Amino acid sequence: MDPFSILLTLTLIILAQNAVRIVGKSQIHQSIWNLYLRYSNDQQILKLRNLKAESYDVYKQRSNTSAQDEYAKWTKLNRKYDQLQTEIKAVSDQVSQQQQAIEKYLGLAISVTTTLPLWLFRFKYRKQPLFYFPKDTFPSYLEWILSFPSVPQGSIGIMFWILLLNKFVSNLEFIVKTFSTKVEKPVPIVKVEDLSPK
């Protein structure tokens, strides 16, 4: 693989890794779970959806029924509503277990896709220089640090490139957060003498 392809691939992987970090795995899990709930044909999810709709209808009927004037009808609706709530809780527990299993595999998939390629690149291309500096650009000790651990002196290797990219993304994130937060306008301090009549 040529150095430019390595640089580009590493940049994309590190940007994806930092995007996951910034957005947060829990937010990604929740978004994917919401999509799964919306478009899934799973029987438990469909049953839960139907039970909630039926429970809402019974609740509306019960609310529109006077407990004093139509006590028998209201009691029947109340019992049905309580029964539906019990069923909803049981089905919700099953769906919650399903959600935990999906989140477990999703978290594993995110971790593998964002960290494994970096480790493979570090191992496979650790001795390949990504680009060279002109001779005597930096002092020899600095060139040695930039080429650490195993590329020729006077070049930048994959380890230092990953370090630079991560630092760049974290600094960029800091700048964006700093300038995007709204700062309250300071309230002027009024001295007691200013309030006294003249």
Swiss-Prot record:
Pfam families: CHD5 (PF04420). Residues 1-6, 132-155 are lumenal. One of its GO terms (cellular component) is endoplasmic reticulum membrane. GO terms for molecular function: protein-membrane adaptor activity. The keyword Membrane applies. It is found in: Endoplasmic reticulum membrane; Golgi apparatus membrane. Residues 27-110, 173-198 are cytoplasmic. InterPro entries: Get1, Get1_fungi, Helix_hairpin_bin_sf. The chain crosses the membrane at residues 7-26, 111-131, 156-172. Keywords: Coiled coil, Endoplasmic reticulum, ER-Golgi transport, Golgi apparatus, Membrane, Transmembrane, Transmembrane helix, Transport. It is a multi-pass membrane protein. The keyword Coiled coil applies. Residues 73-106 form a coiled coil. GO terms for biological process: tail-anchored membrane protein insertion into ER membrane; vesicle-mediated transport. Required for the post-translational delivery of tail-anchored (TA) proteins to the endoplasmic reticulum. Together with GET2, acts as a membrane receptor for soluble GET3, which recognizes and selectively binds the transmembrane domain of TA proteins in the cytosol. The GET complex cooperates with the HDEL receptor ERD2 to mediate the ATP-dependent retrieval of resident ER proteins that contain a C-terminal H-D-E-L retention signal from the Golgi to the ER. Belongs to the WRB/GET1 family. Component of the Golgi to ER traffic (GET) complex, which is composed of GET1, GET2 and GET3. Within the complex, GET1 and GET2 form a heterotetramer which is stabilized by phosphatidylinositol binding and which binds to the GET3 homodimer. This is Golgi to ER traffic protein 1. It comes from Komagataella phaffii (strain GS115 / ATCC 20864) (Yeast). The gene is GET1.
